[in-house]
A protein has these predicted regions:
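Active-/binding-site microenvironments in catalytic and ligand-binding cores
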Residues: 1-326
Length: 326
């Protein structure tokens, strides 16, 4: 039997590296790394890591918002491999758009409405992974990274949920709906510490002081461990109620669809990939072009009962595909 030669290919990493000092979502635990063995004393090196399930480039599972939702470890491994496409929205709702400048001046996010995505219907019908490029990854580490980034609306989430082929929606942004400007301080941008289990943490790890959580937190119904919850003051300023409700609603719509749409947040280097640009004229549609699609792997760690997890994400391009540098 003759062997079929596969076309040459190359990989582009879409993952943000994890390490101490990486900014985290306000209220989430900092990434921490401490050696438990050293070359000089033990003859080998071993490291204890502590980090939240939604740190860096990560996937959200239905269990993130639904007590009976699927966990990441329940999905077959081939769920995380598929063809992907990038929608370049920088000029319409992203950092290069007129809409971005005006709302930012009053601290409100640009809203990504169904009408912004409707020209790309053919792409959503064609590939299981769709990534939205808005130019936000370049703002990582700035105090405004969580402020007013281009945000989905519940109506847009409903629109996306109607595409049966879609199984992973990828974003550069840290969530689906932004904090309004001014809702948290620059100190919060590097992440207040939420304590882990005392038995897990060595003395070298800082931990938040104990407290009595409100009745609405750590209840038996939610299954939350009260020792892992910290007071509001420990988490930085809370989301505005409207933004929190919109973020939760968008998550619930997409993660709650049957089958669910998983959410991949914190992507980088999307600008290096082939992409679909918006149409030049209102009312025009963008036709799917298979040459602009690419195979992608999105591999989270295999952790039992995971509501989310950092993931290694990589796109495989044909060797003759342009590596776009902008």
């Amino acid at each position: 039997m003759e062997r079929t030669e596969r076309p040459a290919s190359r990989w582009i990493d879409l993952t943000r590296p994890l390490g101490e000092g990486i900014p985290v979502y306000p209220g989430d635990p900092l990434f921490q790394a401490r050696p438990f063995a050293e070359h000089s004393t033990d003859g080998f090196r071993g490291t204890r890591w502590a980090f939240g399930s939604h740190t860096g480039t990560h996937l959200d599972a239905p269990f993130h918002y639904f007590v009976d939702g699927e966990t990441l470890d329940s999905f077959p491994i081939d769920f995380f491999v598929g063809d992907a496409a990038v929608l370049d929205l920088r000029s319409t709702v992203g950092v290069d758009s007129e809409r971005f400048a005006a709302p930012r001046s009053v601290g409100r996010p640009v809203l990504i409405e169904p009408s912004d995505l409707e020209p790309f219907e053919s792409i959503f019908d064609a590939v299981p992974f769709v990534f939205l490029l808005v130019g936000w990854a370049e703002r990582f580490g700035r105090a405004d990274f969580y402020n007013a980034f281009p945000s989905l609306t519940p109506e847009t989430a409903d629109w996306l949920a109607d595409f049966p082929k879609l199984r992973i929606l990828g974003l550069e942004t840290p969530s689906l709906v932004a904090f309004p400007t001014g809702d948290f301080s620059e100190a919060d941008a590097v992440g207040p510490i939420r304590s882990f289990d005392a038995e897990f943490l060595p003395d070298a790890f800082p931990a938040s002081p104990p407290f009595s959580p409100p009745e609405t937190q750590g209840s038996a119904e939610s299954g939350a461990d009260e020792s892992s919850v910290v007071a509001d003051a420990e988490l930085g300023a809370p989301l505005d109620e409207a933004e929190f409700c919109a973020d939760a609603e968008c998550h619930r719509i997409l993660l709650g669809r049957r089958p669910p749409i998983l959410l991949l947040e914190g992507l980088v280097s999307l600008e290096r990939l082939p992409s679909f640009a918006p149409p030049s004229e209102p009312g025009e549609r963008v036709e799917f072009d298979a040459a602009k699609a690419f195979e992608t792997v999105v591999f989270p760690l295999l952790i039992e009962r995971s509501d989310g997890c950092p993931a290694r994400v990589a796109a495989r391009l044909r060797a003759d595909a342009a590596d776009v540098e902008r």
